[in-house]
């Protein structure tokens, strides 16, 4: 069989950071804008030279697509729109609020996913780009088993989770080791009788661990030729779109010959001449490739420091705003309302992972102030509603 090595490049776009502020410079989101513009420019150049590379984008909606990019970099939105139409780029779901999906109630989770697709403010992926794949690349790769049924109810085809060689991972260390054939193909995850597809996903660390993307692709293909792998494989590299990994370092010779130093241009060029390589997207690959393995785990996953939730849960500040969140939820429940409660939208916005971490031991002061404002406001709204209800009765 003429098995192929499919390669996809995923850009995780969130311009609202826990460790940087809200200014259009390197102390805020200026680096995001610079690097994303360069990614689009380099991808376009490659396509114009006949290289059929495709990008996969997962945008956060509330802050990036709704506020920051329209004001400071509308050309990025236009550039991705053009690439979707002209070169087959794909948009997948992150979550409306770059939210901690695994920490949400059913109603909060549903809103985060549904509003990411389309919403009244016009910042949904379908609103902006005209289409999206019902595949979720959750913010910080946060996933909780009990939400499989919710993903299925919402028509989600698959979830992308890190299966990484470094402790910035999701599920590699909590299941038996997968063979390369299965590790680079979709797998079926099952929890309490409910199943969904998980797409193993990789970072720049996995590329560096292999030596280079070319080395990784050639190693997998050699196993295809030897019969160790009897299927196509898909290397899906997904990293923050502001990562320097995507940007050429422009090093002088001979340093510029070192692998992984020429950004997205180098990552594409080093495999573009391999006849067994096909450029693809998660949605494109899943259309023609079924899961090859069944996996089970019962832990929550996240890609924080040393893999896990400590980056978002262990600071005293985290406990303060989480207590307020639970208080607002309790008031809403007492009022026999959740998605219709006065605090609901504020709760969804507070549940942005950025209001909890990844930064440690403290967040950017602008981010802390925003989280404190939101959390205080949601409680006050619920208290006011409770007082109003008592007066009516």
Identify the residue ranges that each predicted region occupies.
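Active-site and substrate-binding clefts of carbohydrate-active enzymes
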Residues: 2-30, 34, 192-196, 200-203, ...
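Short, conserved catalytic/metal-binding motifs centered on acidic residues
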Residues: 136-139, 237
């Amino acid at each position: 069989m003429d098995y192929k090595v499919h390669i996809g490049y995923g850009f995780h776009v969130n311009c609202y950071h826990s460790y940087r502020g809200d200014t259009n410079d390197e102390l805020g989101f200026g680096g995001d804008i610079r690097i994303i513009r360069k990614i689009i420019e380099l991808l376009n150049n490659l396509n114009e030279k006949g290289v059929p590379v495709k990008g996969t984008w997962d945008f956060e909606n509330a802050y990036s697509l709704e506020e920051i990019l329209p004001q400071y970099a509308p050309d990025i939105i236009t550039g991705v729109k053009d690439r979707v139409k002209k070169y087959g780029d794909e948009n997948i779901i992150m979550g409306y609020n770059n939210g901690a999906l695994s920490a949400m109630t059913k109603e909060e989770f549903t809103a985060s996913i549904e509003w990411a697709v389309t919403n009244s403010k016009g910042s949904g992926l379908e609103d902006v780009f005209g289409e999206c794949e019902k595949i979720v690349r959750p913010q910080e790769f946060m996933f909780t088993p009990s939400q499989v049924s919710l993903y299925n109810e919402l028509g989600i085809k698959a979830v992308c989770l890190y299966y990484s060689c470094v402790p910035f991972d999701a599920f590699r260390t909590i299941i038996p080791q997968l063979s390369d054939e299965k590790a680079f193909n979709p797998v079926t995850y099952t929890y309490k009788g409910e199943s969904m597809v998980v797409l193993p996903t990789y970072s720049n660390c996995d590329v560096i661990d292999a030596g280079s993307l070319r080395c990784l692709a050639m190693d997998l293909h050699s196993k295809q030729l030897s019969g160790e792998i009897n299927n196509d494989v898909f290397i899906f590299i997904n990293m923050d779109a502001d990562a320097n990994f995507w940007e050429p370092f422009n090093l002088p010779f001979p340093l510029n010959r070192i692998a992984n130093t020429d950004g997205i241009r180098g990552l594409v060029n080093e495999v573009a001449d391999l006849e067994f390589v096909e450029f693809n997207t998660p949605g494109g690959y899943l259309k023609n490739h079924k899961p090859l393995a069944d996996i089970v785990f019962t832990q929550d996953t996240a890609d924080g420091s040393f893999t896990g939730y400590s980056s978002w849960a262990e600071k005293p500040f985290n406990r303060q705003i989480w207590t307020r969140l639970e208080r607002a939820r309790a008031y809403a429940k007492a009022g026999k309302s959740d998605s219709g409660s006065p605090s609901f939208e504020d709760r969804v916005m507070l549940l942005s992972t950025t209001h909890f971490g990844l930064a440690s031991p403290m967040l950017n002061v602008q981010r802390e102030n925003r989280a404190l404002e939101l959390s205080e406001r949601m409680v006050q709204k619920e208290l006011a509603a409770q007082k109003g209800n008592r007066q009516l009765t």
